[in-house]
Swiss-Prot record:
Listed Basic and acidic residues bias regions: 305-314
Pfam families registered for this protein in UniProt: HLH
Subunit (UniProt): Homodimer.
Keywords: DNA-binding, Nucleus, Transcription, Transcription regulation
Protein name: Transcription factor bHLH34
GO molecular function terms noted in the UniProt entry: DNA-binding transcription factor activity; protein dimerization activity; sequence-specific DNA binding; transcription cis-regulatory region binding
CDD domains linked: bHLH_AtILR3_like (cd11446)
Domain bHLH: 162-213
Location relative to the cell: Nucleus
Amino acid sequence: MYPSIEDDDDLLAALCFDQSNGVEDPYGYMQTNEDNIFQDFGSCGVNLMQPQQEQFDSFNGNLEQVCSSFRGGNNGVVYSSSIGSAQLDLAASFSGVLQQETHQVCGFRGQNDDSAVPHLQQQQGQVFSGVVEINSSSSVGAVKEEFEEECSGKRRRTGSCSKPGTKACREKLRREKLNDKFMDLSSVLEPGRTPKTDKSAILDDAIRVVNQLRGEAHELQETNQKLLEEIKSLKADKNELREEKLVLKAEKEKMEQQLKSMVVPSPGFMPSQHPAAFHSHKMAVAYPYGYYPPNMPMWSPLPPADRDTSRDLKNLPPVA
């Protein structure tokens, strides 16, 4: 029932009994009489079953009071409370202040030395089974504020991000960049006015301007298409005119060649006339048909309209 004690110099018996099932401890009262079996030790029955709301996964903070020390005045026996490290097993870290009742975690150690002094056995960096850490340098208010900041869904309204790597800081930087973009967009849409702060109004103006520019671009595309068609038609007319010009140029060259082929006498040239006295005894010179002397000028042929005699009665008077 009791753990074996091998060290006789420093006797330590954490005599804690589980009374949650209703079993009575025969040593449930303080045994300080000399006639008892264990003359130098006392026992105390405790309830080791923790309520559901008092169980924590981890703890990290200030432990204000875990066990209270007391002094018994029977024969100079001094009792000091110590932490039952075998009764609790907490892990990881917990931000907050743990309020723990003393009668649920305390064991007792008795000594027969009259000069003994009440002593609270507590390790600085380790309280429960070497797992729970106590930070005595931080205040309760700072721990509570940190706990509320981490557990609550609200963000702290600070001017600058204390932790650039946190999600709240990244979100704040993203929102600031987005607001700057909206301000730039408002300045571009209305250069002469003060930038708007209403994001919905800025988006409405942007949609209106985009639709207007899209309509103007469509009209310009149609106008450009019409101009391209006109350019094509003008190019075709230009090619036709160029062909006609070439034809006219060829006709002009042909006519010039015909004119050059006709011999035209100079105005100072006159045919030599021989007087009849010198040729009276001679016969007239007869030329064959179709032969013309080389120096004799030629008459140009009459046009067909002048050679037409069907309209002579109308054009000429009958007397003639």
